[in-house]
Amino acid sequence: TLQLICPFAAGGDSDANARWAAQYLTQEMGMDVVVVNTDGNGGAVGARAAKDSPNDGSVALISSSAFITNELSGAIDFGLDEFEFSCICAENPGNIVCVNKDLGVNTFQELIDYSKANPGKLKMAYNSGATTHAIALQIIDAGVDATLVDAGGSSDRIAALLGGHVDIIINSFGSVKDYLQSGDFVGLGLTGDRDAENIPDYKSLKEQGFDVAFPTYFFIAFPKGTDPELPKKVSRAMKNIIENNQEYAAAIKDAYMQSPTYYDGEKGKQKLLESREEIIKYTSAFQSK
């Protein structure tokens, strides 16, 4: 049996991607692959649990770009070099920046203008040390005057915006699409590094000309010292699933508007390190929270 440690609670897109990987790897590799949710501290608890697991091939980490913000915030004191990297196995098409319809703001530029006309008034929710923390800091750099509020995980941030406790949230598109359709929330732009083919109604903030982008990748990595053949074998199996399995492609599109995304070992690790470079300038802000 291979245990995939997912460092986030059940119910979000990290957990969903872990479960898809486990389900299809079980079929593809002919062995039992199961998900173990070990959440806490924005992903740090599970990352440490995976790092400290035996390197006998029985355990791997399936995490997201939050690993990078964990490292920069000091929530973990180790990086990707403490793992045998297997592959990037998925990509979230970007979070979406949302405001409550009552704010009367319909574009990101209008949000900047409103915030400048009302300094200190707006509150923006984020999850400390997670990817939304990085994006929130980029939004402030882009000219939005807002106070940051650590409002916890995805569903907590939605509740805070619905209840009027905060004015701006950054959430995965799948988690807020019902509120966008009902008109309760207004979406101002996606935070991936390009437009998302499965979300045609919203453009990325980057394509709109704003320097706000932090792609969320999901990756699989094994504890250091694991026989390097195993991460390669898992990577090859994921490649086959991602490139050829129609059922998988339909599932990720229906749930989170994802398109099949795969990067092998070195290329995958490079992608994560590139996005780390984008936000390394925020290290002191992450640590001062």
Residue locations for each model-derived region?
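Short coil/turn segments
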Residues: 9-11, 65-66, 100-105, 126-131, ...
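A ligand-binding cleft/hinge motif common to bilobed small-molecule-binding domains
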Residues: 65-76, 134-142, 168-201
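N-terminal (or domain-start) structured segment
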Residues: 1-82, 121, 130-132, 141-170, ...
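Membrane-helix entry/capping segments
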Residues: 162, 267-274
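C-terminal lobe and pocket-closing loops
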Residues: 176-249, 274-277
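Hinge/capping helix and adjacent helix->loop/strand transition within the periplasmic-binding protein
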Residues: 2, 25, 49-58, 72-156, ...
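A short gly/proline-enriched turn/hairpin at secondary-structure junctions
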Residues: 205, 261-264
